[in-house]
Amino acid sequence: MNVLESFSLKGKVALVTGGAGLYGRQIVEALAEAGADTYIASRNIESLQQVAEEETKRGYKVTALQLDLSQDDSIEKLYNDIIEKSGKCDVLINNAVSREHGSLGWDNSLDDFDKSLRINASALFKITNMFAEGMKKNKSGSIINIGSMMGTVGVENGNYEGTDFTPATSPLYFYEKGGMHNFTRWAASML
């Protein structure tokens, strides 16, 4: 076996949440090129369908599915649809993040925190738990959570110099990414 074959994902099924954005798009391309049947899911189905069409033209199998992380039934439907279509999910990449709730600095209401945490923390727990249970039954699988160094070190706006990306200066982003790092450690110890 050569080196590239050892990294092959042929016969594997992968899900990327938030698969049309800055990082998600590159993750989807890599999984598809490695041979995985790749699902991408988020609220913006139009953007996902565009990514899926582009990857299909390149000869890869990428399927766009609707997902609203603020709704439990949407997470459950996504899981059931993937299992029904593919029979399993070998790789879950939690990449989606919502930044629509919250303000700069201290000007955040508890309602903003609750809405943001529902999507970026509670839904992370639910989707990870659902897919992990299936992976445990299959005795195989990988879960990758896309965090940020901002969840560990705090504000580092210099990281964005020279890019067209706007730094996250709402405390919600740092709070949630720090939580994601620790949730990932906990989940790894339990699985």
Question: Over which residues does each language-model region extend?
Answer:
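Catalytic loop of short-chain dehydrogenase/reductase
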Residues: 144-189
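Substrate-binding pocket helix/loop in short-chain dehydrogenase/reductase
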Residues: 103-105, 109-115, 157
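Conserved glycine-rich Rossmann-like NAD(P)H-binding loop of the short-chain dehydrogenase/reductase
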Residues: 36-50
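The beta1-alpha1 cofactor-binding region of Rossmann-like NAD(H)/NADP(H)-dependent oxidoreductases
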Residues: 45-46, 66-77, 110
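Alpha-helical segment proximal to the catalytic Tyr-Lys
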Residues: 133, 189-190
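Conserved NAD(P)H cofactor-binding loop of Rossmann-fold oxidoreductase domains
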Residues: 95-101
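Conserved glycine-rich cofactor-binding loop
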Residues: 13, 20-21
